[in-house]
Amino acid sequence: MDLSNLVTIVIPCKNENDIISKTLDLLNHQTGISGVKVIVCDSSDDGITKLTLWDRLEYNMDYFDLHIMDGGLPARARNNGFKLVTTPYVLFMDADIFLLDSDVLTNVVSKIKTEDLDLVSVRLRSDNGDYNYVYKVFDVLQRLSMLVSPFCLGGFMLTKTSKFKEIGGFDEEVKIAEDYAYSKQIKRDKFKVYNTFVYTPPRRFKDKGLWYMTKLMIGSLLNKNNKEYFKDGKDYWS
């Protein structure tokens, strides 16, 4: 499958030199990745990440078509990246999402097309096995939440471009869980989470602590209709 005419990938990034390098290296191994537009929306100020990204671009190191744009908080960064999207689907990925299975993209894009869905996601697991029990608990909570409305996290969000335009993109007033705020606007029968796995370093659990992350997730669920709750960044990005 030639993905270049089907999907564009948008990745917010800030001060994640080694991580974004690994993410992009793994993207090079995806089946059908040749020519796919990959837009990294970077707001790094560490003096290293920007150089790494521009070196990749200058020396044409990737099979995909790399673009670099200004970033910001995830909602703004993703909306910026979307300005270059011309394909029928767009994949919003976090900078620390590792696609270890080389057929993840072709499989998921094929399914969203065949099933005519507006938004799909996949299962998350840690790249070293730590905290996987937390991800499994989240899987259960996500299934329960989906009885009422879609619940999607922004680590891996593949959405129909026309639907993204219809919704108006990510709400830039929202500082946390902008991905969840977007997914709530999708009809239940147009959303699905596939039993395909992608991997991520459990750095937020290590940096913020399990209790903080648990409170944030439960708080998001309990305040799903309270936009003011999500306007406060709650020190997540500090």
Which residues are covered by each model-predicted region?
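Short, well-formed alpha-helical segments that are part of the catalytic scaffolds
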Residues: E16-H29
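Glycine-rich, basic loop-to-helix element that forms the pyrophosphate-binding segment
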Residues: M69-V85
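A recurrent flexible, glycine/aromatic-enriched loop bordering the glycosyltransferase active site
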Residues: L124-G129, L141-T159
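A conserved acidic beta->alpha catalytic loop
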Residues: L26, C41-L53, I97-F98
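Conserved donor NDP-sugar-binding/catalytic core segment of glycosyltransferases
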Residues: S102-Y131
